[in-house]
Each structure stands twice: as C-alpha cells, then as structure tokens.
A protein has these predicted regions:
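Short, glycine/acidic-enriched loop or turn micro-motifs at the edges of active sites
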Residues: 93-94, 168
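Generic enzyme active-site microenvironment
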Residues: 88-89, 163
C-alpha cells in the first residue's frame, strides 16, 4: 500500500511540475548559468547524452549566446525579447573537454571555464597525491579527473574561454594578504603564461560572497577586469567606465 501511495505521489508531483512549467517560463533577461561537471563522481563519457538532453530542454525556452556576448549585454543593459543564457563551469574537470564543450558546440556557443591551475599542473605532472587531495578533500568529488593544458589549448582554438579560480581552489575568506595575493594574483600570471592570452575573468571558489571578505574582493578587482560570484545575482555592479 505504501508503495502504491509513493508511486501516486510521484505521478502527481510529476504532472504538477509539468503544468507549473507550462505556466511559468523564464523571464526575458540575460542569465549566466554556473555549473561544475556533468557527473559528480566519475568521468563516463556517456553522461554527455544527459547533458545534451538538459540543453535541449533548456533551449526550448531560452536562446544560447557566447559568454562574452552575455557579459556585454549585461554591462550595456541591453534588452532581450527572450530568456538568454550563457554558460560557465568551475574547477576545470576533464568532462569540460570530453562532454560539455562538444554539446555546446552543437548550438554554436562557447562557455567560460574557471580553472585552478595547480590542479591542471597535477594532471600533466601525474601528481597523484595532489589530485587525490583536491578531489577527495577540497572539492568532495572523488573519482574525477582534471582537464589538461593541452585540452584547454584545443578548446581555446575552438572559441572557448578560460578564467581564474585561484591556484588551489582556495577559500578566500581570510585576511592573509600574502596568500591571497599568491592565490588570486599569481593565478592570473600562470593562466596567461600557460594559455598565451590575457586572463581578465575571476570567479570566487565556493561561489558566494560569504566565502570572501573585503580584502580578497579588493585584490581580485585589482587583478581582474571581471569578478564573478553566485550571490546577489539580480544586481550587477560594474565601473562607470564600462
């Protein structure tokens, strides 16, 4: 009996969400969506099919644009007639290369990938201890693998963009100015040295402003033209010069 009730609740919930989805559609604004990976605990390339379905469902209600175009639209307060979406992904996982990028290319758009350079270095140097600590302890994603610099360079040639995310996915909610300068400022230097292009974009690890404080925010704004968090998403701040 409990099993039947559970199934009925599931069916009712499914139908309710379907009807609610028909009533409520995304508002005609520009959205920059943030993700991390296709699957949290492994790198099964078949998961690209699931991401493809998610994109197909989203595309019914939203236009997809390149990341840099979305940034321009937001800064210039450009109006849009339909929900408009660009994509970012944090941490630099291998499925950014094997699954995410190939699916986005089918829609003719890129993404911004925010990278932790020391994680990518660990892949190139086969530093198993660092990769295990990063995946198990830092990001709670055991079984995942980093994107390599060669893969990033290939994606860069295909129009994808790369930003900074601190060297080690460092939680910047402290006042250790020396370490903050190292993690935030030196991250830009490494990104530019490895990829050969200016690195103007930075995203806070862990995503929200409570994971930062005035000191790291000031340092980030000193080193980067654009600084992203997941907080206060309805209020965009930019300089009067933009």
């Amino acid at each position: 009996m409990d099993s039947i009730k559970s199934k009925l609740r599931s069916i009712i919930r499914s139908h309710f969400l379907s009807v609610a989805g028909l009533i409520k559609r995304p508002s005609p604004y520009v959205y920059i969506l943030n993700g991390h990976m296709v699957d949290w605990h492994h790198d099964n390339d078949s998961d690209g099919e699931r991401f493809a379905k998610q994109l197909a469902d989203l595309h019914k209600y939203c236009d997809f644009v390149n990341f840099e175009d979305a940034v321009r639209m937001i800064i210039k307060h450009e109006s849009v007639k339909r929900c408009t979406v660009a994509f970012t992904f944090d941490d630099g996982w291998r499925d950014c290369y094997t699954q995410i990028a190939p699916q986005l290319e089918k829609y003719g758009v890129n993404a911004m990938f925010f990278i932790n350079p020391n994680f990518a270095d660990a892949a190139d140097n086969n530093d198993v201890a660092y990769m295990e600590n990063f995946t198990v302890n830092t990001t709670k994603s055991p079984g995942k693998h980093p994107i390599t610099w060669d893969q990033m360079k290939d994606l860069q040639k295909r129009g994808f963009l790369f930003g900074a995310h601190t060297l080690d996915h460092y939680c910047i909610a402290d006042n250790n100015i020396k370490e903050l300068e190292h993690q935030i400022g030196d991250c830009r230097k490494v990104m530019e040295e490895k990829l050969g292009v200016p690195c103007e974009f930075f995203a806070f690890p862990y995503g929200r402003l409570e994971h930062a404080n005035p000191a790291p925010i000031e340092i980030a704004c000193k080193h980067y033209k654009y600084v992203f968090s997941q907080s206060d998403h309805k209020h965009f701040s930019h300089s009067a010069e933009e």
